[in-house]
């Protein structure tokens, strides 16, 4: 089993990084969409972009989140990192990002259905969490 993990570990890491990149890109795109929406006038038909953004979220961002979770969990288990001090901090930042994504998905669904909602932009929080996750994963303090 250890030999299998040793062989698959580089692939798991690659899958983890690619899926994380897709997930973060989707969350940032939604955040930027909310910013654009806040800046434009009410005369523009908003649900069209929201439907497209929501569809993208369903087919790309959400699956990437689950693939990131699964591959990260496998890597952490086989790397025996659950006793390390940096992993809980990384998981906390990941959970914050997952929560932001859930909130964004809800807003996108409501906007796509024509419901007028108040949108919040979370770009700075997303960037801080992403940078923190990357630093913790590389440095492993």
Predicted regions and their residues:
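Polytopic transmembrane helical bundles with strong interfacial aromatic enrichment
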Residues: 1-141
